[in-house]
């Protein structure tokens, strides 16, 4: 914006006729000075001058409240408290990153990348230890903000995000897309964290453990006034959805970050492009060395393939991009005493040794337990009860024993012996050839497996039995009302009133939820069975490929490996699961209890004339929703990609097609307009 003289803004006479114009000018000036201070690091007025502008705007808004504009900087102080957070479905998933913990991990990642796309350069940036946030701007105005949540659905934290001073309520300039999603990290600077805990200490209140917890807790306040007082900050690290997709964007990740900065969004000054692998390692070491001197907490660095076209060619796996990795810093380490070992039995029957430690403060938390994983890990460490051990928080999250201190071993140290029988049900503990993990052979007869298996079966992503929480499942099993998943469907409301804090109304609601859960999908049912390494994505692929449970039950390992993203190991797990008679008994009992799903029609070869072809959509389609077009093309067997390459079979070009059309013409890719697409779809309807 054009600079407006400070004296003019502070002295201009205000009347009802010009109040709106003056207030807008003050808001624009204050917002511009915010960007210069937080983003450009080049303030052009003093703090006292900024305060005088703010006070003048506050006084005018008090006189003319009906003229307050949405992007006024005064609106950052927080509004009315919410009763709860609304849910927001992300326009596209907010994926997590794979981790590298050493040079070997990163080298393997680098090889996977270069094997697929050739030489690359990386955009390297600090991995902030905060909370991932999506911010949506429409016509340059902040419309909504959400947490990452489970990656697909997050919580609406718009009012809280508006209180973060470094986030512009309105983008700078006018060269941004009509709709732009900005993704980044909200965090609490170290100084703000220390001040927050100092205030809490003075009031004898509970202290926050670390800045990340403080940031997460602050952003999830129902009262945005509390968030406003917490001095949060934000750095943008990526573009999300952009509409229209024909809007010109930079061709590298680094340049896109500079675009975000030009629009007024804060971007870390520690970002660097590294063309050589040695430069990547040097960057990692440099940031690690300066970690304690930075104004914010980090737990590693993020390496992203810089070229956007190469990113698109690399694509994604189920939960993370193939073109980026988080190179984690070594966790903080401490020494403590191994006082004993307990053995826990998990949902799949895995018997896991858990170290009981003399409590020690490490990585911001007090640690008293750590997994020892399996017998192989115990042998590798050469560990005994009574040893002094070195504990660290792997990835700053999971406590891990990394070594023992042999010279401190007492004469009374004793070997760690795996139990021959399950510590929960007494069944034989088996360790199959080639597997590191020992397992209880008790299956669903084992109470530990039964509880975890039924919790999983009823969970939101499985059969989604509303109200069937962990404590309810534990009571149902403890009171011997349920011994297998099928028993859930035999429960009545009167039976469930036997549970603690379960009145007839709650029991009736839960009974209705159980009845409703009988109607599900094959994909959810497969996921609910708890087959090893079969997550949501794999369950969906299995359901789509085989179309029926009967076909899947008799599938061979070879047939299973034909399913998308199912390798030999997962195929063996699935085949072994359906080969076990007690698993089939459970499935048959569930079907007999009324669990069902709509039939899936397996597409015939005739119905998929585009099978094996790669199509791309670009530009604006006037007669057909883009998602509908994509779904109909996929139903005909096509793979719908996001970018044009030499492997593209056809580009559907709507209005304002832009660079993708030019690239398709350059590569000689077939181009089809919307009318031709509609004719094709109609012919194959």
From Swiss-Prot:
SUPFAM superfamilies: BRCT domain, DNA ligase/mRNA capping enzyme, catalytic domain, Nucleic acid-binding proteins, RuvA domain 2-like. Its cofactor is Mg(2+); Mn(2+). GO terms for cellular component: cytosol. InterPro entries: BRCT_dom, BRCT_dom_sf, DisA/LigA_HHH, DNA_ligase, DNA_ligase_AS, DNA_ligase_CS, DNAligase_adenylation, DNAligase_N. The keyword Manganese applies. DNA ligase that catalyzes the formation of phosphodiester linkages between 5'-phosphoryl and 3'-hydroxyl groups in double-stranded DNA using NAD as a coenzyme and as the energy source for the reaction. It is essential for DNA replication and repair of damaged DNA. This is DNA ligase.
């Amino acid at each position: 914006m054009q600079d407006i003289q400070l004296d003019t803004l502070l002295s201009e006479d205000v009347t009802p006729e010009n109040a709106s114009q003056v207030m807008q000018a003050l808001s624009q000036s204050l917002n511009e000075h915010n960007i210069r201070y937080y983003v450009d690091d080049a303030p052009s007025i003093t703090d006292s001058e900024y305060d005088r502008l703010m006070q003048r705007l506050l006084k005018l808004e008090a006189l003319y409240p009906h003229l307050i504009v949405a992007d006024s900087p005064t609106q950052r102080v927080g509004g009315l408290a919410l009763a709860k957070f609304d849910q927001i479905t992300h326009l596209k998933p907010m994926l997590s990153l794979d981790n590298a913990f050493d040079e070997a991990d990163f080298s393997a990642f680098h090889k996977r990348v270069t094997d697929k796309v050739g030489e690359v350069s990386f955009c390297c940036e600090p991995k902030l230890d905060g909370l991932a946030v999506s911010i949506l701007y429409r016509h340059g105005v902040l419309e909504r903000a959400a947490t990452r949540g489970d990656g697909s659905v997050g919580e609406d934290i718009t009012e809280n995000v508006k209180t973060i001073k470094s986030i512009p309520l309105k983008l700078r300039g006018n060269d941004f897309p009509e709709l732009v999603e900005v993704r980044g990290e909200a965090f609490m600077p170290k100084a703000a964290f220390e001040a927050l805990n100092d205030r809490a200490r003075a009031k004898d209140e509970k202290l926050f453990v670390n800045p990340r917890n403080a940031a997460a807790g602050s952003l999830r306040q129902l009262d945005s006034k509390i968030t406003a007082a917490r001095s949060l900050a934000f750095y943008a690290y990526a573009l999300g959805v952009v509409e229209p997709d024909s809007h010109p964007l930079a061709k590298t990740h680094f340049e896109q970050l500079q675009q975000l900065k030009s629009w007024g969004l804060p971007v870390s000054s520690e970002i660097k492009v590294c063309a050589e692998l040695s430069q990547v390692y040097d960057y990692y070491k440099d940031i690690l060395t300066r970690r304690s001197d930075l104004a914010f907490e980090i737990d590693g660095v993020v390496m992203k393939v810089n070229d956007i076209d190469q990113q698109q060619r690399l694509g994604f796996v189920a939960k993370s991009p193939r073109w980026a990795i988080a190179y984690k810093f070594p966790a903080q380490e401490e020494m403590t005493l191994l006082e004993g070992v307990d053995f826990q039995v998990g949902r799949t029957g895995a018997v896991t040794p858990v170290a009981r430690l003399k409590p020690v403060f490490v990585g911001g938390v007090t640690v008293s337990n750590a997994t020892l994983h399996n017998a192989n890990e115990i042998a590798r460490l050469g560990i005994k009860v009574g040893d002094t051990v070195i504990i660290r928080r792997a990835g700053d999250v999971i406590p891990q024993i990394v070594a023992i201190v042999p010279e401190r071993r007492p004469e009374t140290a004793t070997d760690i012996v795996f139990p021959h029988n399950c510590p929960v049900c007494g069944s034989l503990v088996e360790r199959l050839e080639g597997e590191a993990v020992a397992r209880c052979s008790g299956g669903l007869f084992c109470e530990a497996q039964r509880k975890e298996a039924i919790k999983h079966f009823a969970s939101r992503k499985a059969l989604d039995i509303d109200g069937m929480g962990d404590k309810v499942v534990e009571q149902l099993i403890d009171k011997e009302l349920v011994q297998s998943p099928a028993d859930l469907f035999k429960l009545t409301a009167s039976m469930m009133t036997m549970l603690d804090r379960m009145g007839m109304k709650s029991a009736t609601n839960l009974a209705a939820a159980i009845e409703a859960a009988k109607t599900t999908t094959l994909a959810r049912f497969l996921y609910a069975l708890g087959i090893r390494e079969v997550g949501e994505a794999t369950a969906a692929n299995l359901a789509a490929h085989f179309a029926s449970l009967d076909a899947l039950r008799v599938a061979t390992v070879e047939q299973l490996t034909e399913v998308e993203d199912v390798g030999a190991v997962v195929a063996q797990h699935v085949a072994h699961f359906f080969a076990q008679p007690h698993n089939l008994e459970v499935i048959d009992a569930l079907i007999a209890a009324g669990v069902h799903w709509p039939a899936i029609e397996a597409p015939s070869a005739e119905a998929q004339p585009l099978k094996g072809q790669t199509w791309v959509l670009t530009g604006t389609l006037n007669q057909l929703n883009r998602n509908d077009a994509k779904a109909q093309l996929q139903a005909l067997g096509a793979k719908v990609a996001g970018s044009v390459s030499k492997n593209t079979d056809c580009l559907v070009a709507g209005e304002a097609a832009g660079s993708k059309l030019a690239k398709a013409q350059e590569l000689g890719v077939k181009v089809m307009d919307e009318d031709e697409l509609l004719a094709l779809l109609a012919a194959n309807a």
